Amino acid sequence: MNHMNKAFVSKVEKTLIPTCRIMGVNLAAINMPWLIKFTKKYIKELSGDYMCVSNVHTTVMSYEDASYCAVQNGGIMAIPDGGPLSSVGRKRGFSEMERTTGPDYLKEVLKISAEEGYRHYFYGSTEETLRKLQDTLTKDYPGVQVAGMYSPPFRPLSEEEDKAIIDMIKESKADFVWIGLGAPKQERWMAEHQGEIEGFMVGVGAAFDYLAGNIERAPMWMQKANLEWLYRLMQEPKRLFKRYFYTNTKFIWNAVIRGK
């Protein structure tokens, strides 16, 4: 269902965001403290807009698919979830650019949610994962307001179902709408619903699974050494080997060697 809202104009000036272009994707050359400060200042204006959480895989996909690249560049910003992206950015002179992951952003926002009064809607994943996620939120983030959760069917939605979801999220009065459909599906979904969903949409991929305890995150030393991809590869070798081998090679050739 392609109803991208061409008329949508961001209420926040994009020139406020330092940007490094890597393989055609405009990546925010930022870090977590900057992003949290930005979020707190502009959360009301960000309603209806979306943010991509970008890594090497999504950047290579964007390089090969102009329509997906337009989606990555069509939101308020694309943050550098992948360590290699921030490394390339720093080499290109963006000294403040640091790896800023989706799961970490979600956690940082949850930490300040009770005092800020933020309401959260979680869209994606399975009902079982959403139940576990709810347990984690209740236990680890007391006072956090969950406005709603919904696990959509895997098949394409009808116009009526889609409209019902838009209405359901609107009625929830959520400030944040966290999307856990995985790339590239979640980014395309956010772009199609830009200006239709009330709340700030953030595509956080596996963050629901991390918080629910389905997938363990890499130890901190591996995260800091940009080796989280290797840890994920050891967890799911069949699913991830081809993807990592192909995209990492393509990224190194284009972004690192050719300077794209």
What are these regions, as identified by a protein language model?
Residues 55-59, 181-186, 207:
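Short glycine-rich anion-binding loops that position phosphate/pyrophosphate groups of nucleotides
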Residues 86-168, 172:
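Conserved beta-alpha
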